[in-house]
Amino acid sequence: MVEPKYKRILIKLSGEALAGDKGVGINIQTVQKMAEEIKEVHDLGIEIALVIGGGNLWRGEPAAEAGMDRVQADYTGMLGTVMNALVMADSLQRVGVDTRVQTAIAMQQVAEPYIRGRALRHLQKGRIVIFGAGIGSPYFSTDTTAALRAAEIEADAILMAKNGVDGVYNADPKKDKTAVKFDELTHRDVISKGLRIMDSTASTLSMDNDIDLVVFNMNEAGNIKRVVFGEQIGTTVSNNL
């Protein structure tokens, strides 16, 4: 049997991905399909953590621009990520995958607090861990959460599962028909070229901690498995190219 390229991964999902075609709210059938895709990889013995954005329920920056206090707006967004985490955890449990939600803001009735050692033990025991509530502080995105948690759990790679986007381009392919897709980039290329795969804090964290980043289209069945086994799909960002 072919050995996987990545044995411990952190999958970063946008909140909008949970909304399906509507783009807002949560579509349970869409989440269930994602859970089945994730289970397929989990059943191969891959250790999996998840970070899910909250943009399907709330976006802090526009609220702040409209006059809301930025700190309060960001905390509201963190609660949205917990809602998404709980829904995904339920879907994973329903397909037979033992799952734990850990939050950076304590809410004992619904989730465990984030404790690195406990998260690592869950992964080692074959449980999926979903990290909610960002890093618990305003002004930090869920991309930064993904990079930080990936470093803390010593993940081999962050899988940026995009909704209908099959990689990183030098221009917006929806607006520019001449846009060229990159198969590979270094983290330094991403930062120097200003490619907005993640925010700059997340990109720097990934580079400094030598974590591969794979940007791929999550809408094509089997793509998570393909990435894990090293097939060339999407765009791979690494220090080692």
UniProtKB/Swiss-Prot annotation:
Q: Cross-referenced SUPFAM superfamilies, in alphabetical order?
A: Carbamate kinase-like
The Gene Ontology biological process terms listed for this entry are: 'de novo' CTP biosynthetic process; UDP biosynthetic process
Location(s), subcellular: Cytoplasm
Activity: how regulated: Allosterically activated by GTP. Inhibited by UTP.
> According to its UniProt record, what is one Pfam family this protein matches?
AA_kinase
Role, per record:
Catalyzes the reversible phosphorylation of UMP to UDP.
Under PANTHER family, the record lists: URIDYLATE KINASE, URIDYLATE KINASE PUMPKIN, CHLOROPLASTIC
Q: What is this protein called?
A: Uridylate kinase
